[in-house]
Each structure stands twice: as structure tokens, then as C-alpha cells.
């Protein structure tokens, strides 16, 4: 399994852009996307989701309305978005619990 907090640089103009390898993913994926994120704008995340939908990957891509890049970490000051952070950490822990034998 794998998770992406914010989704930065998952879609680029390069020939080796990560989203182009989505068909090779075998594990469950989780993507947490901030609504306000200059590093992963909606258009970029939409391209990622389009690519993911063409595969059989089990994934969850969630938007966090009103949240900015860095929302999940309390030490980010005003950027920290408590409600979104709590939901994000619940989703991430659930992903890890489902997929990792500890």
C-alpha cells in the first residue's frame, strides 16, 4: 500500500511522470488532496484520477475543502486544518491497518 499526502509532483510533463506508471501499481493507494494547493492544483489531480480510473487499482482519492498544502501537520501554524487533518489521519491509519501485518 502507499499514500500520498497532497499529491505534489505525481503528474508532470516528463516522459517518466509517476502517473504514467499507475498501471503497474498492485497495492491499495490513498491520496489526500488539499483544495488550495499550488503544488498539486485540481487540474493535476484530475489528470491523476483519470489515469487511476483506467486501472484496476483499489484507491481512494479525497479532496479536503478549505485545506491548504500542509494541512495535516499542527506545526504548520495557520495552514493546519484540524478537521481535515483528523479525517486524513483516520483514513491513513485505516489503509495501513488493512494492508500491513504488524
Go through each PLM region and give its residues:
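Short alpha-helix in the alpha/beta-hydrolase fold that links the catalytic acid
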Residues: 16-18, 41-51
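N-terminal Rossmann-fold cofactor-binding loop
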Residues: 6, 33-35
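Acidic catalytic loop of the alpha/beta-hydrolase fold
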Residues: 12, 36-40
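Short, hinge-like loop/turn segments at secondary-structure boundaries
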Residues: 19-23, 48-49, 78-81
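C-terminal catalytic histidine-bearing segment of alpha/beta-hydrolase fold enzymes
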Residues: 53-102
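Alpha-helical scaffolding within the catalytic cores
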Residues: 10-20
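Short beta-strand/loop motif that positions the catalytic acidic residue
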Residues: 25, 31-33
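A conserved short beta-strand
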Residues: 1-9
Amino acid at each position: 500500500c502507499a499514500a500520498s499526502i497532497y499529491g505534489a509532483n505525481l503528474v508532470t510533463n516528463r516522459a517518466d511522470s509517476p502517473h504514467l506508471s499507475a498501471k503497474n501499481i498492485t497495492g491499495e493507494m490513498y491520496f489526500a488532496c488539499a483544495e488550495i494547493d499550488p503544488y498539486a492544483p485540481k487540474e493535476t489531480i484530475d489528470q491523476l484520477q483519470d489515469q487511476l480510473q483506467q486501472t484496476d487499482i483499489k484507491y481512494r482519492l479525497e479532496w479536503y475543502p478549505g485545506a491548504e498544502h500542509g494541512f495535516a501537520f499542527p506545526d504548520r501554524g495557520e495552514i493546519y486544518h484540524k478537521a481535515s487533518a483528523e479525517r486524513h489521519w483516520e483514513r491513513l491509519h485505516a489503509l495501513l491497518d488493512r494492508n500491513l501485518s504488524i
